[in-house]
Amino acid sequence: MQRSPLEKASVISKLFFSWTRPILRKGYRQRLELSDIYQIPSADSADNLSEKLEREWDRELVSKKNPKLINALRRCFFWRFMFYGIILYLGEVTKAVQPLLLGRIIASYDPDNEAERSIAIYLGIGLCLLFIVRTLLLHPAIFGLHHIGMQMRIAMFSLIYKKTLKLSSRVLDKISIGQLVSLLSNNLNKFDEGLALAHFVWIAPLQVTLLMGLLWDLLQASAFCGLAFLIVLALFQAGLGRMMMKYRDQRAGKINERLVITSEMIENIQSVKAYCWEEAMEKMIENLRQTELKLTRKAAYVRYFNSSAFFFSGFFVVFLSVLPYALIKGIVLRRIFTTISFCIVLRMAVTRQFPWAVQTWYDSLGAINKIQDFLQKQEYKTLEYNLTTTEVVMENVTAFWEEGFGELFEKAKQNNDRKISNGDNSLFFSNFSLLGTPVLKDISFKIERGQLLAVAGSTGAGKTSLLMMIMGELEPSEGKIKHSGRISFCSQFSWIMPGTIKENIIFGVSYDEYRYRSVIKACQLEEDISKFAEKDNIVLGEGGIQLSGGQRARISLARAVYKDADLYLLDSPFGYLDVLTEKEIFESCVCKLMANKTRILVTSKMEHLKKADKILILHEGSSYFYGTFSELQNLRPDFSSKLMGYDSFDQFSAERRNSILTETLRRFSLEGDATVSWNETKKQSFKQTGEFGDKRKNSILNPINSIRKFSIVQKTPLQMNGIEEDSDEPLERRLSLVPDSEQGEAILPRSNVINTGPTFQRRRRQSVLNLMTRSSVNQGQSIHRKTATSTRKMSLAPQANLTEMDIYSRRLSQDSGLEISEEINEDDLKECFFDDVESIPTVTTWNTYLRYITIHKSLIFVLIWCLVIFLAEVAASLVVLWLLKETPPQDSGNSTKGANNSYAVIITSTSSYYVFYIYVGVADTLLALGLFRGLPLVHTLITVSKILHHKMLHSVLQAPMSTLNTLKAGGILNRFSKDMAILDDLLPLTIFDFIQLLLIVIGAVAVVSVLQPYIFLATVPVIAAFIILRAYFLHTSQQLKQLESEGRSPIFTHLVTSLKGLWTLRAFGRQPYFETLFHKALNLHTANWFLYLSTLRWFQMRIEMIFVIFFIAVTFISILTTGEGEGTVGIILTLAMNIMSTLQWAVNSSIDVDSLMRSVSRVFKFIDMPTEDSKPTKSVKPSKDGQLSKVMIIENQYVKKDDIWPSGGQMTVKDLTAKYTDGGNAILENISFSISPGQRVGLLGRTGSGKSTLLSAFLRLLNTEGEIQIDGVSWDSITLQQWRKAFGVIPQKVFIFSGTFRKNLDPYGQWNDQEIWKVADEVGLRSVIEQFPGKLDFVLVDGGNVLSHGHKQLICLARSVLSKAKILLLDEPSAHLDPITYQIIRRTLKQAFADCTVILSEHRIEAMLECQRFLVIEENKVRQYDSIQKLLSEKSLFQQAISSSDPLKLFPHRNSSKHKSRSKIAALQEETEEEVQETRL
């Protein structure tokens, strides 16, 4: 960044903003880079400003019981704020004085007032000087206020960020990330924009008082008629504003509904294409868009009338002020023209400035109070440590994640009494003692220096909470903790900060080469680092998106190990690693490298327990066992069930085995009933309305929710570049059925009840604490794949006795949750994170305007219509002027024109009624014409928006995956949310305003030029100068805006990154470093924003200077050339003053239009995306086996219905090569093999070897070369849709969209209910669907959050059965399944797909053993393609993976279908026992 010229600028340069010229010149000539931006003045640096405000806020906290943030702000900024306010007032006063001089000039032309004629020229000079003074006062004042607003925002940003790093985990649990981002973006922007308006809360009343005094002098009491009209108008506009908000609120629900489905479509675009659902999704979204646009039109019409009311009001104000006076006393012309000028200023003060100022104060004070509440939240307390301590001791420790359980108990009791009095006593007192269940109960252990403690337990047992308590994140309510305080921590979910691999591992600790190399080697990172060209200096993006899940996990572990500490806390560090890597790291790192350190390792692996010095097994928060492994075997023979999280199967009823949903439903209805009577947001159990549910305001992390019958866990895997597709799914802990998610960790990512209300359900806000406990992958947007939707898993841990009261207590506690923002528009918040670096031109091209205008033929006619009406208006005014000129001087009538082509035709007292008629007649005509002009324009522009949305949606759905892989999901969604909102809401009204203002100016210039042709000569250069200046400024301003927008993203990204790694940050004590990074991001944004404000002010000032020169020219031309006739001078000068203010407004409007048209450019960019080549690329030829008839029938469109192809499911793959993008590396090379009809083939390979890529290649979702044939038909000879319909797909990332069960199973509506129920029976879905009200018509929302992951898999199975597919592709179908659902799926696969070809990519060995052949993929190629016997006899990956099991024992399973079927319960029991021995590849 360059040094700012501002530092050396002179006073004159600062006053006229001339110091910005170099950047304006550079921006005009070339594209600006970040290096071209000037450094910020030291007074604006985040360090200085935050220190200043922090000091004052600390003073406020120390000195008062009730500290006020506004007092701290006042002490920092008040005097400068008032100084600029006074300057602003003086600038505004000049506006009120100008009409007095104008009146005197007009009076000097009165034949009876010859004496004043000589001083007219001096009055003209005085009037021009007033304009110059106004310009020199207003612009510095407005800039100064914007500058103070920016400084206040920076100081508060910093204060909020610092506070966030200090918040206790309990508070973080109650705040969602959306609320925090909203606090920073929505609330604080109010200071930037609003501070310049704030002073009008006192300036406007003073201005009105002054003007009314001056008008009283002119018109006496009748002046108040005009004021009364303006007050009524202001109230009318407020009413219209309220009506508009009503429509917009209704519309918000519809927009949310559309965006949810659009978002689901974008995130699952691969599945949409695999299922051939493009047309169905398009139709569904367009139907929602239709309803939304009806409300958009209503809101636009109301806004249009609101805007028009201002334009048309000018005439009536003058008319109502003048008429009573004229009727009673008659009137002289100069009073009329003076009145007109006064009324223009008055109108602005009453209808615009004062209401805006009041709104600004209301918003700003609200924002300050919210921030004040946030700054007073409870902070994290570090424990008191003794550095000489060598052991770790915990004595009788109990802890709660929640506080204030006594109050909750009372509240629940009252609520329960109320329920009993209503006759509903079925719910409570069953487990009342569990209200406020501690997360840890009476835990005691002691480990000496150098010992390894293994902590194990089922999901939600309290393992992570134990580590949190040692770190001080969770405060014990009883008991003692003792350790030295020198801690290192490795989180369960790996956290990567933006920076190099080396910076992530060293993490601010002093660099030691030997230690660093040892850690890299022990954590198995050497090979990974060597693959990168930059080695360990490769810069990792947000969340480390270039890395696989396993690599991220190992870097997080290396960071923890590199720090020299006394105690190492390792929370399931091996979750993402395959068996072999995990074994090596445990041996070399945990056991050898850290041998003399104290370690606490959360694990569920038997091998780790055997090696540990001490074992602590937790169960439901209590210490189930503490001791050595040998003691464990002797004392607790049943430990495996506690460790794994489920007991033996005979505890379950038959009903429970058939459908896990029964318990889920029971949980939902409990929660619904428990909350409905008192919860503000009336959450109800499965009560469907026509709309989807209300917006949720719950925290995501519900600590206590995790201790329930089923732990529902959120996972958001990221699929990466084809190289690491499988790797981002965390492998489960070996002896636990689900990832060991802690309470206070990955709990319901979205609402677990269905809300009913006016708006569609958005994604639930994520509490900050939950953000930390989820995989860092979630926020990272892969370059090549989209982030996956949340998937859920059910643990089989019965834990039945912990459900009702825990959920109830959690719901109660949510009343005390922090509500930072009542209404957070989270889709809008996305713009904080996804700012595409655009390749669109710096200024909107004429081509974009031309395409926009011609996309809907009616728009051209509407624009011509506007022009015709405008010409009629000008013609009318010229006719009136001509009539007036023809009238004899003694009866001279004169006309004038208000800000809207309205006329004030005033005749001397000969006929007051004649005045009245002309006024009303002319005004009515113009009012009608103005309305006719605007409404069709607004209506047509909304239709254009509708067409653009349709075209863009079609383009995205038809685009090839290679194109979509290069785009961020957030970027695509921004086009449908942010840009469509601009096209719907802002653009039509801004274009209307611009056209209206432009026509007013042209009309006024035309009238003036007719009256005084010389003025036309002055007008031409002014308009030319304005066009050149606008073009010159626009190039730079749009680039600065874009850079500012890009600079906003790092601020919010850094906030989210810090929150995800907050526990790690605090464990390593790196808060100051991260505060510095945050300040750097703030300063970068400030540099862009400050420069944008300065250049904008430069432009506004230059425009005003041109107008001042124009006005001086007009004044002197009219004074020197008019001769007799006060009317003409009056009209010319009044209109010239109008032209000044209106043309400036028009210029700003034109810049707004250009800025908004960039959204249109972005939309066109999406519309122009390439489409998939769906037509056959070669003619059909008979294959070698002579299946001529089959091939020929393919050309027939009814081929699918006749079930002729594919008939057997035979597949032949020849030389298949697959790439993700056109110029990318080959992910798979020269793959060749064939599959017999009905055969089952298993895909084997390490994480990231390309198994999922191969399945995508079969579906032609990638760039592929080579050939695949199904039953002799080549993929080149039929359409893409026909080819994909040959496959049934169960993807890794299950896709359930918001809609009914029926829609989800059959979006095209091809099958009747009978057929759907039949298939539901086959796959075991009937019992699931029947338990929902409405059955097939039950509406699923939020990705089907009421279903377990297993049931979603069953829906995918049912889709495949309905599609009559002969080839089934399964990608990790058991990845997140509990044993029961897994057995249902296995059974379904055996029965429903008995005669189908099945290709299976799977991690579970047991599932793979049912395959007849195996395809082993290594290094992008096929290594082996053989039967299981051959693979076991050779040294292969498969053989290594199951070396610990007895191969012979595994063999009977392969042919299990030939065995006589055993009783169902016995079979399930045996199969599930084998799950315990489960091994993963």
Curated annotation (Swiss-Prot):
| GO cellular component assignments | apical plasma membrane; chloride channel complex; cytosol; early endosome; early endosome membrane; endoplasmic reticulum membrane; membrane; nucleus
The source's domain of life comes to: Eukaryota
Write out the catalysed reaction: ATP + H2O + closed Cl(-) channel = ADP + phosphate + open Cl(-) channel; chloride(in) = chloride(out); hydrogencarbonate(in) = hydrogencarbonate(out); ATP + H2O = ADP + phosphate + H(+)
Q: What residue spans carry the region label Interaction with GORASP2? A: 1387-1481
Query: Where do the segments described as Disordered lie?
Result: 1449-1481
For bias type Basic residues, the affected ranges are 1451-1463
> Which keywords belong to this entry?
ATP-binding, Cell membrane, Chloride, Chloride channel, Endoplasmic reticulum, Endosome, Glycoprotein, Ion channel, Ion transport, Isomerase, Isopeptide bond, Lipoprotein, Membrane, Nucleotide-binding, Nucleus, Palmitate, Phosphoprotein, Repeat, Transmembrane, Transmembrane helix, Transport, Ubl conjugation
Q: Which residues lie on this side of the membrane: Extracellular?
A: 99-122, 217-222, 320-339, 880-918, 1012-1013, 1117-1130
Q: Which NCBIfam families match?
A: CFTR_protein (TIGR01271)
Write down what this protein is called.
Cystic fibrosis transmembrane conductance regulator
